Amino acid sequence: MSKTKDVKKVVLAYSGGLDTSIILKWLQTELGAEVVTFTADLGQGGELEPARKKAEMMGIKDIRIVDVREEFVADFVFPMFRANTVYEGTYLLGTSIARPLISKHLVDIARETGADAIAHGATGKGNDQVRFELSAYALNPDIKVIAPWRDWSFKSRTDLINFAEQHQIPVAKDKRGEAPFSVDANLLHSSSEGKVLEDPWSEPPEFVHQRTVSPMDAPDKVTEIEIEFLKGDPIALNGKKLSPATMLAALNDLGRDNGIGRLDLVENRFVGMKSRGVYETPGGAILIVAHRAIESITLDRGAAHLKDEFMPRYAELIYNGFWFSPERLMLQAMIDKSQEDVEGTVRLKLYKGNVMVTGRKSKKTLYSDALVTFEDDRGAYDQKDAAGFIRLNALRLRTLAARNRKG
């Protein structure tokens, strides 16, 4: 607590949920600090106005709700998708990629308002505390960060609910009148954790899924779409030009209706433990398939393979909170260079949780009908050349086999 005793004004990353509402009250009562709330409109939907009303009810005078949807998708989500980024083979990093943007705005507002510190609601067990703070320190090495979960005496959500009741802080309930799961949402994804999901053998109840219909309940008909790309980013859907945020929102709607993007996974947290979550990334699940498809005809083999080699490291940097690190920026420069000629159109069919590529075309294509045809290629490729190619590549293998045969 000693590092916070001189804090007079704090900028709080505020969602309006249980944790950050209690943190708001804690900052007021325990520190006697003036609190500025910052709520990022990341496309999470109906949480924004309730967050404003709750902050007003708790006496906050400076309430910042900032629409960052276009910035989020254009400057964070799309650069990540240029790399086909997946953490541990499955996770599209929907929570991870939002944290550096939130930290950026926290630092900016703290500078603007003359605040002594910023604060967040991430627990001491999770990744988000690392992501928020590494990003903040990368942008302002002298910033003071308050992380109440590491300082206060509360040990559980039950403790928080008891504190909320003592201070007349409204506690949200789910549709069944129970305390909700721990939920994070933005334009890219939604995640649900806690309660019954803490048992990795327990099947997630259907009501946990907030953004997608079950694949079993999706329509018994195919939805066909076309996505146009330029420099690795989607720019048009079914021939209509869309802004980055509008594009992702439209893909989300298509994914939602067709049961696409559900994921139940156990991941390795940066802090060392495993955690289980249920994630929904409907638009992102469509986008990554489409992006790989357009790369398949426009990206050189060597460049594509090198890019794939670096992708796990790039994904790990984002997951662990190093978005503003020099190594992430170095990799981003390489990735962006690779995307200069990644343009064209991909045709997809969406059906009951599946995303199927049915066509791809580009003015920058490297695909040659003349080279791959089973018919007469009119001299485009001399098959006799393959004999020397094989002979040279087999040289070391034959040498090794000859040695081993001698025994």
From Swiss-Prot:
Location in the cell reads:
Cytoplasm
Annotated ATP binding lies at 13-21, 40, 121
Q: Which domain of life is it from?
A: Bacteria
Q: List the Gene3D superfamilies hit by this protein, alphabetically.
A: Argininosuccinate synthetase, chain A, domain 2, HUPs, Single helix bin
- GO CC, alphabetical: cytoplasm
What residues bind L-aspartate, as annotated?
123, 127-128
Please name the InterPro entries in this protein's record.
Answer: Arginosuc_syn_C (IPR048268), Arginosuc_syn_N (IPR048267), Arginosuc_synth (IPR001518), Arginosuc_synth_CS (IPR018223), Arginosuc_synth_type_1_subfam (IPR023434), AS_cat/multimer_dom_body (IPR024074), Rossmann-like_a/b/a_fold (IPR014729)
KW Ribosomal protein (keyword) present: no
A Gene Ontology MF term for this entry? Answer: ATP binding
Q: Per UniProt, where does L-citrulline bind?
A: 91, 96, 127, 131, 182, 191, 267, 279
Name the EC number(s): 6.3.4.5
Question: So what does this thing catalyse?
Answer: L-citrulline + L-aspartate + ATP = 2-(N(omega)-L-arginino)succinate + AMP + diphosphate + H(+)
The biological processes this protein is annotated with in GO are: argininosuccinate metabolic process; L-arginine biosynthetic process; urea cycle
Quote the pathway field. Amino-acid biosynthesis; L-arginine biosynthesis; L-arginine from L-ornithine and carbamoyl phosphate: step 2/3
Q: Which UniProt keywords apply?
A: Amino-acid biosynthesis, Arginine biosynthesis, ATP-binding, Cytoplasm, Ligase, Nucleotide-binding
Query: What NCBIfam families does the entry give?
Result: argG, PRK00509.1
Q: How does it assemble?
A: Homotetramer.
Similarity comment text for this entry = Belongs to the argininosuccinate synthase family. Type 1 subfamily.
Q: What is this protein called?
A: Argininosuccinate synthase
Organism, as annotated = Mesorhizobium japonicum (strain LMG 29417 / CECT 9101 / MAFF 303099)
Taxonomic lineage per UniProt?
A: Bacteria, Pseudomonadati, Pseudomonadota, Alphaproteobacteria, Hyphomicrobiales
